[in-house]
Amino acid sequence: MLGFFAVYGNPITHSKSPFLHNYAFTKLGLSGYYSRILLDKGANLRQNFLSNGLSGANITLPFKEEAFNQCDEVRGVAQNIGACNTWVLEDKNHLVGYNTDAQGFYECIKEYKIKNALIIGAGGSAKAVAMILQSHNIPTTLINRSVQNLSFFVHKGFECYVNSEFKPTCSYDILINTTSAGLNDNLLPCDESQLKELCSCGKYAFDLIYGKCTPFLALAQSFHLSCSDGKEMLINQAALSFELFCKQKYNKGNLEIQRIASFMNEIL
């Protein structure tokens, strides 16, 4: 048995991760099982993981920073991001954290030839997106509804503003919503007039929310921006996580990321 896996979040009923991972297990002939777990408090994340006997997990909103703080070791880009979306249990109780959101996002936009970017939000997903853009030398600005969480980005050298104080002084090639606005409501991630001004001179709009046309994307479409939801990013990060879940017990030569992603794309 490869093991039991799950995705943690709140809310979590919308998550398609179980479909993706269980389908990939089936296609590859692996005896793994993946489910969803609703968690009320992030402080209980590690305890819940261990008590459920999981071998690995994905972590989504709003627990990615908690996941970073509660694992025993952090590897790869997650060390700079300060947020983990993937946990893998090594040995008996050694919990290793990774971030596959960053590369999963970049795979979606690497062909866009972006000169600069604006990120809306300042949570764990924003950290992943911002840091991968910075690693590719793409100037990036962040805006958030409050000053909370912006200090991380300021220390990393990003230009940051509170929404109410932000006045665009240039156009941005891509607008990226990393907030939960539009997931279970009809809210925009920032003021409508502000967003209209940004869309009027933008090229691309990307919403990390997947499976629906959010108010953010609907507004961007009305300005004829090229729009993408988070489906491709979901598949990319899931395939990267899947490889991490399996690599200790499965022949890595058969775990090409693109092959896993193609399986997952069949089911979503």
From Swiss-Prot:
Biological or metabolic pathway of the protein: Metabolic intermediate biosynthesis; chorismate biosynthesis; chorismate from D-erythrose 4-phosphate and phosphoenolpyruvate: step 4/7
Catalytic activity annotation: shikimate + NADP(+) = 3-dehydroshikimate + NADPH + H(+)
Cellular component, GO, one term: cytosol
Keywords: Amino-acid biosynthesis, Aromatic amino acid biosynthesis, NADP, Oxidoreductase
MF term (GO), any: NADP binding
Coiled coil ranges: none
Role according to the record: Involved in the biosynthesis of the chorismate, which leads to the biosynthesis of aromatic amino acids. Catalyzes the reversible NADPH linked reduction of 3-dehydroshikimate (DHSA) to yield shikimate (SA).
Protein name per UniProt: Shikimate dehydrogenase (NADP(+))
